[in-house]
Each structure stands twice: as structure tokens, then as C-alpha cells.
UniProtKB/Swiss-Prot annotation:
CDD domains recorded: cinA (cd00885)
PANTHER family linked to this entry: NICOTINAMIDE-NUCLEOTIDE AMIDOHYDROLASE PNCC, NMN AMIDOHYDROLASE-LIKE PROTEIN YFAY
HAMAP family recorded: CinA_B
Protein name: Putative competence-damage inducible protein
A UniProt-annotated Pfam family: CinA_KH
InterPro entries: CinA, CinA-like_C, CinA_C, CinA_KH, Competence-induced_CinA, MoaB/Mog-like_dom_sf, MoaB/Mog_dom
Family note: Belongs to the CinA family.
Listed Gene3D superfamilies: 3.30.70.2860, CinA-like, MoaB/Mog-like domain
Superkingdom of the source species: Bacteria
Amino acid sequence: MNAEIIAVGTELLLGQIANTNAQFLSEKLASIGINVYYHTVVGDNNKRLQKAIEAAEERADILIFTGGLGPTKDDLTKETIAASLDEALVYDEKALALISNYFKRTGREFTENNKKQALVLNGATVFANDHGMAPGMGVNKNGKVYILLPGPPKEMKPMYVSYVEPFLRNFTTGENIYSRVLRFFGIGESQLEVKVQDLIDGQTNPTIAPLANDGEVTLRLTAKHQNVSEAEKLIQHVEDLILERVGEFFYGYDQEFLHYKAIELLKRKGLTLACAESLTGGLFGNQVTENAGVSSVFKGGVICYHNDVKQHVLRVPEEVLHTDGAVSKECAHYLAENVKDLLKADIGISFTGVAGPDASEQKEPGTVFVGLAIKGEQTAVFPLNLSGSRQQIRERSTKYGFYHLYKKLEEI
């Protein structure tokens, strides 16, 4: 079955709030085999809402509305749908009692417009609002399913999980949707697509959806099957084919981000880490400490932005700074080795480069060197030539640092 999500509210059109409900609902609907092909946003205007309803009825089996169930005059969703379906609005006694009791408890006047929140479509299945006033509702009429939900996410999300999804399962084929995200780094989206283009072109079940995100590329594999284990087998087969071709760039699944994977591997190896940050100015250390329990492996870091700190704290030779420059392979080498020794860590990592927007030491913005020194191993320096804004260059440099750390840890 196909669904359309219609968000009602002028504040959405004005950009005053983001439509996070649509993202949540699309993901949840996909997981129970309901396709979402359209998101519509319409203001608080009954004529435009009516047109949106008519358009959605032409292309969707399920129409899901969020917003417009409140007590004010511009809350028009129920009234407009009632008129469209030629159904009366009636009071839901449970909702009316809930709202009435709230006003009694707070000592406020229970006005007629507040009673409006308890109105539901005649014959509808009513969804209790456990976190607010206005109930939701579901109606099956003329071969279409109409779902009305409150706009505030704190009300809508728990209502969907507790009441709406079980209701919608009555209209699905029973197919389960299983998804797995493969995460890649060090390869561009276009390069990766070329290597797996035939798999993408031939996709049916599972489907393959590539997505680039600031230096990373993900492939979302999605399979449908009434049996979850069979869906997993379908995905595993395609994953194996993909990793045969681009496995060297693969680092994790789903929400396993680079910094998490690198730190978890560091913990398993029982090794400690220190960082020297010039270009990144603490970004790397900040992401390290986002991981719980990291104090067992992270010794600390030095933000060595000024050359005096590079020379006098981290003992980069003056000759290197004068001859090769602070932005150089040689400087990154010394920074990584010496921060490791200074903080008595097993591994030292360093970042030096030009974030821009102007050149420095006659080197263009995006010129970056990441140093990696590991006790008992030869120190490596990875030169990078990055593009983007100042902040993007710094953030991408940090990601490359985690990537090279992760790959090196896999080897030892």
C-alpha cells in the first residue's frame, strides 16, 4: 500500500519549525511495508487543504495528516476532512473528560473552543493522546484510510507507536521490511556507484540506495519479505557482492560512526591515544570524548595552534618549522611522535594544515597532513587535499584521522 503524509500548519511553510514528523512517519511506515511517495505541506487554509486531500486521494491508499487538531480557529484539519468525507464530527467522551479534568485541576475556565479538541469523525477509531489533549483518529472510507494525528512530535510519536501502527497493520500484506546501512569512507559517491552500478541497475529486492554525507558514503539495503530471516538473507547476499568490490573502504553498519568504531577498536586492543591538534583545534579530541568510557584509552591532547607551542611543548625542531613549515609532512611526523611520548600513550595522532579561506606558507586551503605514530611501528603521515569551507575542511580532516586510526588498528 502507498501512503501520503500531509503536514498542516502555516508555521511549517514559513520555516518557523521543521517537519520532523514526516521523517519519523516515513521511516516507521517503511518498516511495516507501506510506501511513502509524497510529502505535502499545506498552510492553515481549508480550500488549499481540500485540494491537497483531493490530490492525495488520487495517488495514495493511506492519507496521514499531522497538525490542525487544536482548539483555535486556524486548526481546520478535522473540519475539512469531515466535510470532504461527508461525515459528522461528534464528541469523544473519554477525550472530553480528559480535557475537562485538566482544566479543573489547573483552575482554568473550560471554554467552548477547548471542547473542540475532543471532536472526532463519526465512526472513527480513536487514538488516545497520552501526552496531550487532542486525540487522533483513523477512518476507513471509500477505499481509503485517513489518519489524523496531532502536530507536536511529543504527542504524535508515542501515539503512532502505541495505537496507529497496530491499526495500520490491519491494512498491510504482512510483509516485513528489513534495512541495513553499509558505511564507507575514503571513496567518493560517484566512484562507489561505478563499482556497484550493475547491482544498483538490477535492484528489485533488496533495493540499494546510495547517499553521500560530507566525506562518507552509505548504501542502504532494503528487503521485503514476510519472514524477517529471509529478508536478512536477501540483504546478506547483496552485501557480500558489494564488499567483494569495495570492502577496503567499508568500516561499519547503521549508526556505527567512524569515531565510535575507532575508539571501540582502541578499547579492544587495550591501547591508549593522545592527539596534537593544530588545524582541527580540538575537534578530534571533542569527538573522542563523545564516546562513553573513553577515559580508559584517551590520555589527552595538545592544541598546538601557534608555532611556539609546536616548538617548545611538542619539540618540533625549529629548522623544520622554518624550512618545511608548520603545514608539512615533517611537522605532522614530529607532532604525532612527540605527543605520544609527552603524554605516555601508545598512539599519537596529529593534524596540521590550511583550513582557509586564505593560503598559508604558500600552501592552498585544504592542504592537510595527518600524522599517526604507534609504539613499535613506523610513523606514517597521510597527505590530504580537501575542498570545502573552513569548517568542512577541519571536520573532514578529523574524519580522515579516525579513518586512518581505525584502519591501522585493524592491522595490529
